[in-house]
């Protein structure tokens, strides 16, 4: 009798664990598909395999609300129902319930695997960690920047690099090259028309979101070095390094005597961004740095760290100081308010649209426009070039895609127009900007393009996998097509490994 009670207790305990686990798992899959780009398994794999400390502070509360608390509520209701049935003397078999909950758990696990296409992760991990092979693609198309003659201009121009989180050219109107009836980013659209904007046609446009370039860490690496993110980090003696044998925009400008600063409102170690940026010439100012130097309160934290409103104010102060030096400067910025899935609504944001992300984008457009106007009013602006780029396209979740929901175009038409935003303001007068339209390009091409916009002369116009868009020479996408390039850059190659 005693043994039977112990057995029943253990069966009920196991049954409850399986029920709670299954409910939480089912709801967590739904939550993940509403908040993360689970269809982009390569992105998810690479981000999770890097340093994820410093993540969005709202993720935990979102998880609480999205599946932890609801699953607990479901479990409590489940136990109440069992209690009522027991009070009514309805026989409840622990063994039968354990079997039912085991079937429930198996069904949830199988459904989760199917919905998340989870088999892709071990397959891709095997590919990433497999034996590297020699790549004919790299041999034919990679131009070693260390062997390219780069002639700096006699008078070096300052550079302000603004990487805007998830900024796309598709946020413009349909008639201007975007996908919406109303322009979400009217200021950036107007400024793009008035300045240099590289595009696949005569309208406002941008670059292809290739594999290995389509999330923040990958966007920064690919735009600054001309190579993709394919497990670029290596750890030696406890230190993390990133593409030590690749030349970056920061390395080139550092060698030309520039002062380099890169600012962000989040923590620099997320995705090992510090290893990349600091390893290639930049002094990184992140939320920790700004707290230590009194820019923000020690205990202040919202969203990923602090909002863009404060970042732009800090940038104005830092640019004013950098401009006092006799050396040219390169000041990089990474905004964050427009991060998926819904962005961060600061005090400046208005409710112009039904979707919160669209309101945050409109607010970001207004803030960067005010910052551009401030720069134009400074004494140093005449010798300063501003390059604005989306770090990547918006990472929509399978069950949360405001672009598809709010655009009048078909899904196919939308996908054809989705490109990361690019804008060059006040480039060197010595360059030829006639080639800015009817170009198919990617993040790789921004490295040599930005350098030439500063007045540098690049022999052949090629650096790494990038081709300057100021040249008539074809980019990789123009030469091979997007599908072929994606296939080749997602192979583990000996040539890429040699850059680590």
Residue ranges and their predicted role:
Residues 38, 42, 101, 118-121, ...:
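Generic intrinsically disordered, low-complexity segments enriched for polar/acidic and small residues
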Residues 144-500:
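Solvent-exposed soluble domains appended to multi-pass membrane proteins
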Residues 1-130:
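Transmembrane and membrane-interface helices of multi-pass
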Residues 37-40, 133-134, 138, 248, ...:
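A diffuse structural propensity rather than consistent per-protein peaks
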Residues 44-45, 124, 134, 138, ...:
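Generic structural signal of hydrophobic/aromatic residues within well-ordered alpha-helices
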Residues 129-146:
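Short extracytoplasmic/periplasmic juxtamembrane "stem" segments immediately C-terminal to an N-terminal membrane anchor
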């Amino acid at each position: 009798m005693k043994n039977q009670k112990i057995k029943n207790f253990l069966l009920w305990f196991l049954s409850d664990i399986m029920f709670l686990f299954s409910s939480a798992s089912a709801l967590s899959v739904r939550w993940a598909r509403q908040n993360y780009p689970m269809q982009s398994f390569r992105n998810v794999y690479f981000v999770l395999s890097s340093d994820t400390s410093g993540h969005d502070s709202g993720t935990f509360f979102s998880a609480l609300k999205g599946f932890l608390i609801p699953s607990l509520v479901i479990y409590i209701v489940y136990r109440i129902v069992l209690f009522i049935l027991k009070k009514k003397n309805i026989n409840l078999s622990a063994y039968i319930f354990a079997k039912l909950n085991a079937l429930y758990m198996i069904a949830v696990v199988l459904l989760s695997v199917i919905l998340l296409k989870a088999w892709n992760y071990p397959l891709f991990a095997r590919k990433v960690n497999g034996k590297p092979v020699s790549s004919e693609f790299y041999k034919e198309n990679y131009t070693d920047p260390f062997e390219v003659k780069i002639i700096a201009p006699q008078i070096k121009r300052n550079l302000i690099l603004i990487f805007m989180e998830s900024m796309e050219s598709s946020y413009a109107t349909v008639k201007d090259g975007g996908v919406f009836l109303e322009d979400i980013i009217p200021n950036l659209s107007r400024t793009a028309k008035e300045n240099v904007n590289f595009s696949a046609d005569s309208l406002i446009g941008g670059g292809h979101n290739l594999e290995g370039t389509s999330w923040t860490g990958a966007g920064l690496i690919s735009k600054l070095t001309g190579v993709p993110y394919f497990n670029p980090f290596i750890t030696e003696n406890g230190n993390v390094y990133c593409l030590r044998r690749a030349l970056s925009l920061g390395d080139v400008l550092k060698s030309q005597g520039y002062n380099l600063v890169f600012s962000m409102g989040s923590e620099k170690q997320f995705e090992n961004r510090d290893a990349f940026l600091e390893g290639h010439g930049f002094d990184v100012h992140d939320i920790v740095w700004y707290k230590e130097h009194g820019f923000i309160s020690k205990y202040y934290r919202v969203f990923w760290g602090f909002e863009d409103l404060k970042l732009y104010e800090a940038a104005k102060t830092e640019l004013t100081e950098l401009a006092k030096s006799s050396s040219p400067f390169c000041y990089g910025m990474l905004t964050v308010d427009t991060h998926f899935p819904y962005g961060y609504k600061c005090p400046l944001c208005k409710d112009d649209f039904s979707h919160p992300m669209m309101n945050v984008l409109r607010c970001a457009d207004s803030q960067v426009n005010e910052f551009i106007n401030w720069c134009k009013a400074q004494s140093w602006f005449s010798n300063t070039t501003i390059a604005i780029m989306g770090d990547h396209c918006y990472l929509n979740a399978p069950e949360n895609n405001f672009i598809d929901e709010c655009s009048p175009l078909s899904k196919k038409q939308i996908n054809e127009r989705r490109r990361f935003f690019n804008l060059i303001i006040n480039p060197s007068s010595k360059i030829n900007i006639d080639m800015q339209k009817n170009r198919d390009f990617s993040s790789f091409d921004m490295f040599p393009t930005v350098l030439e916009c500063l007045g540098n002369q690049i022999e052949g116009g090629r650096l790494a996998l990038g081709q300057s868009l100021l040249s008539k020479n074809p980019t990789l996408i123009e030469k091979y097509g997007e599908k072929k390039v994606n296939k080749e850059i997602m192979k583990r190659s000996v040539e890429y490994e040699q850059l680590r």
